[in-house]
């Protein structure tokens, strides 16, 4: 089975992300969760914090590794000797953007395939953006994220 790269910002990782990683772990020998650093984005959590939270949320999965990256995804996939990019599709609205990304990645790295998974129904409405919003207003996010994420966001918002 090929190695798969699951890229994302993961600001923060949610149970929806973890569900996709768990399911991909049954399909592929090795999953590399690639936490993106994009200087054009202003994430709530820095790259190290995001990587650490992904590690904690996926610690129960023996075939998952976590690394940060800041270069072109097609180049990163090649550096990792992977042949598949995993992406999640929550709704039809995600499809057009993901389709464009897959086409561009195919142009840049023709040997790499993109695979799309949909989340479990009970997780399809969860997004990192919503989690940050709820947490910033003091809401309970524990149902939607790993306990380490709940703790990290509570701490982050109590500092501000």
UniProtKB/Swiss-Prot annotation:
GO terms for biological process: coenzyme A biosynthetic process. It comes from Marinobacter nauticus (strain ATCC 700491 / DSM 11845 / VT8). Its main location: cytoplasm. Reversibly transfers an adenylyl group from ATP to 4'-phosphopantetheine, yielding dephospho-CoA (dPCoA) and pyrophosphate. It is found in: Cytoplasm. PANTHER family: PHOSPHOPANTETHEINE ADENYLYLTRANSFERASE. This is Phosphopantetheine adenylyltransferase. It is an enzyme of class 2 (transferase). The gene is coaD. It holds the Pfam family CTP_transf_like. Its EC number is 2.7.7.3. SUPFAM superfamilies: Nucleotidylyl transferase. Keywords: ATP-binding, Coenzyme A biosynthesis, Cytoplasm, Magnesium, Nucleotide-binding, Nucleotidyltransferase, Transferase. ATP binds at residues 9-10, 17, 88-90, 98, 123-129. Its cofactor is Mg(2+). Pathway: Cofactor biosynthesis; coenzyme A biosynthesis; CoA from (R)-pantothenate: step 4/5. NCBIfam families: coaD_prev_kdtB, cyt_tran_rel.
């Amino acid at each position: 089975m090929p190695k798969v790269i699951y890229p994302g910002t993961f600001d923060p990782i949610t149970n929806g992300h973890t569900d996709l990683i768990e399911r991909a772990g049954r399909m592929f020998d090795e999953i590399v969760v690639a936490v993106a650093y994009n200087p054009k984005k202003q994430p709530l959590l820095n790259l190290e914090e995001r990587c650490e939270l992904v590690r904690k949320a996926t610690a129960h999965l023996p075939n998952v590794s976590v690394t940060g990256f800041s270069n072109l995804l097609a180049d990163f996939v090649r550096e990792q000797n992977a042949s598949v990019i995993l992406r999640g599709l929550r709704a039809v609205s995600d499809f057009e953007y993901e389709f464009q990304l897959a086409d561009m990645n195919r142009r840049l790295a023709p040997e790499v395939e993109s695979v799309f998974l949909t989340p479990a129904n009970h997780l399809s409405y969860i997004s990192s953006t919503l989690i940050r919003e709820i947490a910033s207003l003091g809401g309970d996010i524990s149902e939607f994220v790993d306990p380490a994420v709940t703790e990290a966001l509570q701490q982050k918002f109590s500092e501000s």
